[in-house]
Curated annotation (Swiss-Prot):
The gene is rplM. Belongs to the universal ribosomal protein uL13 family. It comes from Bacillus cereus (strain ATCC 14579 / DSM 31 / CCUG 7414 / JCM 2152 / NBRC 15305 / NCIMB 9373 / NCTC 2599 / NRRL B-3711). The lineage of its organism: Bacteria, Bacillati, Bacillota, Bacilli, Bacillales. This is Large ribosomal subunit protein uL13. One of its GO terms (molecular function) is structural constituent of ribosome. Keywords: Ribonucleoprotein, Ribosomal protein. Coiled coil: none annotated. NCBIfam families: rplM_bact.
Length: 145
């Protein structure tokens, strides 16, 4: 009888990938990056172990949203004070906080809990084309489609 392979956290080899967000659709990019972060693109994927790779996203300020979402999509947050509900449109987020916009989209597609928090630490998002991770020798990741 064969046993099912279970990856161990200390045996996982992690790669570094660079993803260029210029002209990419927000949700399609986020779902693929979330899959890489979890390790679902590997044959050694184990649901309860962090088997994913590190991802660097550049040009977050040039992300694309389809339809009229730039004006219609609203991001809500609360200050934890009475009457402290704040809102921003996607256009304001892309202009002023492009990194946060991408991080919110990707983290919403990751597991909620200890594993999700651990996985999200491997995500690095930068608004411009420069990133400080040259020493890790990241590979360029081509998105599907």
């Amino acid at each position: 009888m064969r046993t099912t392979f279970m990856a161990k956290a200390n045996e996982v080899e992690r790669k570094w990938y660079v993803v260029d967000a210029e002209g990419q659709t927000l949700g399609r990019l986020a779902s693929e990056v979330a899959s890489i972060l979890r390790g679902k693109n590997k044959p050694t994927f184990t649901p309860h172990v962090d088997t994913g790779d590190h991802v660097i996203i550049i040009n977050a300020e040039k992300i694309h949203l389809t339809g009229n979402k730039l004006n219609d999509k609203i991001y809500y947050r609360h200050t934890n004070h009475p009457g402290g509900l704040k809102q921003r449109t996607a256009l304001e987020m892309r202009t002023n906080y492009p990194v946060q916009m991408l991080e919110l989209a990707i983290k919403g597609m990751l597991p909620k809990g200890r594993l999700g928090r651990q996985v999200s630490k491997k995500l690095n998002v930068y608004a411009g084309a420069e990133h400080p991770h040259q020493a890790q020798k990241p590979e360029v990741y081509e998105l599907r489609g």
